[in-house]
């Protein structure tokens, strides 16, 4: 239908009518009512390949990977929108403007800004476990205050994407001169993000090379 589109470059589909989206494995799982391992086997058979036998550990890792991507996608989308539209974030926009970075650059690199006292953890914890959110590297537990803190609060954020254009980590920069805070920070390494294996803007470089 006209509302259904497939992005060959990023290897995902999206239906604007139902908001359903995902990769080829998601599509087969939804349309055939398969589990992940069954979808892989089915596609391998269609391609004339010997399928890999997925274990329960493989399926659990795939589930964790999807949760990880969803957390980062929601996080980046929310704070990108806030930077573009929230009137109280004019200081962040002015900071970028003084460095010749306007709305076009903000959209191109999907920059965002996080206020000093954010509360996005409360929104995400309705969908994900506290352990999963901490494992993403975006949050940590302040044991003295017994509360979860957003690692990039008070910073401009720059998504670090995988080669498919999906955010898997962040770079952050403070916009105020505070000697007790590091000017730049990056996401810590996680089970799904290894600093030596990902380059900033690698997905954009791939587009330019095609």
Q: Which residues are covered by each model-predicted region?
A:
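Short, conserved phosphate-binding/catalytic loop or strand-edge motifs used
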Residues: 11, 45-49, 93-98, 103-119
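A general alpha-helix detector
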Residues: 23-27, 74-78, 91-95, 119-120
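N-terminal single-stranded DNA-binding subdomain of primase/primase-helicase replication proteins
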Residues: 1-33, 41, 54, 67
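Helical mechanochemical/support elements of P-loop NTPase systems and associated helical scaffolds
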Residues: 24, 35, 39, 92, ...
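Phosphate-handling DNA/RNA-contact segment within nucleic-acid enzymes
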Residues: 60-67, 74, 115-210
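Terminal peptide-recognition signature
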Residues: 15, 28, 96, 158, ...
């Amino acid at each position: 239908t006209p509302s259904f589109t497939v992005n060959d470059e990023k290897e995902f589909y999206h239906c604007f009518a139902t908001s359903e989206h995902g990769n080829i494995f998601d599509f087969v799982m939804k349309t055939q009512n398969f589990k992940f391992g069954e979808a892989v086997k089915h596609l391998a058979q269609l391609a004339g390949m010997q399928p890999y036998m997925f274990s329960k550990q493989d399926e659990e890792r795939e589930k964790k990977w999807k949760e990880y991507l969803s957390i980062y996608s929601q996080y980046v989308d929310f704070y990108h929108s806030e930077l573009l539209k929230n009137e109280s974030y004019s200081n962040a926009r002015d900071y970028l403007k003084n460095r010749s970075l306007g709305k076009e650059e903000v959209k191109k690199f999907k920059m965002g800004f996080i206020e000093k006292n954010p509360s996005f953890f409360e929104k995400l914890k309705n969908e994900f476990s506290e352990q999963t959110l901490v494992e993403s590297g975006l949050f940590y537990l302040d044991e003295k205050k017994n509360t979860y803190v957003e690692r990039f609060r008070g910073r401009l954020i720059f998504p670090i994407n995988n080669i498919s254009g999906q955010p898997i980590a962040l770079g952050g920069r403070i916009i105020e001169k505070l000697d007790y805070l590091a000017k730049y920070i990056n996401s810590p390494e996680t089970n799904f993000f290894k600093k030596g294996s990902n380059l900033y803007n690698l997905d954009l470089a791939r587009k330019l090379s095609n």
